[in-house]
Amino acid sequence: MGRIRQTFIKRTGEELIEKFADKFTSDFEENKKAVEEVAMISTKTLRNRIAGYVTAKVKKMNA
């Protein structure tokens, strides 16, 4: 069983995918930089969790 992500992470990730779909790929490192560019995220941990969620969503969409 996987970990359940917080609603804030899911909501933020979904909004970023809707607005900036062309910036995100299936590569976590690139998504980390993209999240930092387009969103005002206060902590590194939160940025990484959102980038991880976006990466997983992009991989599911492309599969």
From Swiss-Prot:
The gene is rps17e. Keywords: Ribonucleoprotein, Ribosomal protein. GO terms for molecular function: structural constituent of ribosome. NCBIfam families: PRK01151.1. GO terms for biological process: translation. It comes from Methanococcus maripaludis (strain C6 / ATCC BAA-1332). Belongs to the eukaryotic ribosomal protein eS17 family. The keyword Ribosomal protein applies. Pfam families: Ribosomal_S17e. One of its GO terms (cellular component) is ribosome. This is Small ribosomal subunit protein eS17. InterPro entries: Ribosomal_eS17 (IPR001210), Ribosomal_eS17_CS (IPR018273), Ribosomal_eS17_sf (IPR036401).
